[in-house]
Amino acid sequence: MPGPWATTLTFPGHNGGFGGGPKCWLFWNTCAGPRRVCPKCSCPICVWHCQLCFLQKGLGIRHDGRRKKRGTRGKGRKIHYARSITESGGQRAPNCASSSASCQTWALKHGINC
């Protein structure tokens, strides 16, 4: 029987009931470690396997220095900016691609070369 640092927990079974679920020691003697290898599953039973499983799977705290990778911006992606007021001769240009018909008609109407 472990010392006073251990707590006995009753877990819900995979069938959803609390009756007769597996009993486990949450905070084991850290020198001895858990009795079995930590499972890779993140179900509610495996989260409570040991203190390390609870911190990593249950709370999402990782102490191994790994960080989530961020996606980088694609190389072929371009952003179209509207022309400044001084370039367009005092007229504001619409913020659209120059190949669209509405942009070309607006530019012809106001005397601006697209």
UniProtKB/Swiss-Prot annotation:
Cite the InterPro entries for this sequence.
Answer: IV_Tat, Tat_dom_sf
Task: Give all cystine bridges in this chain.
Answer: none
Per UniProt, which keywords does this protein have?
Activator, Host nucleus, Host-virus interaction, RNA-binding, Transcription, Transcription regulation
User: What does the record give under GO molecular function?
Assistant: RNA binding; RNA-binding transcription regulator activity
Q: Where is this region: Core?
A: 54-65
Q: Which GO terms describe its cellular component?
A: host cell nucleolus
- Matches recorded under Pfam families: Tat (PF00539)
Q: Which residues cross the membrane?
A: none
Q: What is any one GO biological process for this UniProt entry?
A: positive regulation of viral transcription
UniProt superkingdom: Viruses
Region Cysteine-rich: start-end pairs: 38-53
Span(s) of short sequence motif Nuclear localization signal and RNA-binding (TAR): 66-83
| Annotated compartments | Host nucleus, Host nucleolus
Q: Which family does it belong to?
A: Belongs to the lentiviruses Tat family.
Q: How does it assemble?
A: Binds to bovine CCNT1/cyclin-T1.
Function of this protein?
Nuclear transcriptional activator of viral gene expression, that is essential for viral transcription from the LTR promoter and replication. Acts as a sequence-specific molecular adapter, directing components of the cellular transcription machinery to the viral RNA to promote processive transcription elongation by the RNA polymerase II (RNA pol II) complex, thereby increasing the level of full-length transcripts. Tat binds to a hairpin structure at the 5'-end of all nascent viral mRNAs referred to as the transactivation responsive RNA element (TAR RNA) in a CCNT1-independent mode.
Any other comment in the entry? Also binds to BIV and HIV TAR RNAs.
Q: What is this protein called?
A: Protein Tat
This protein's species is: Jembrana disease virus (JDV)
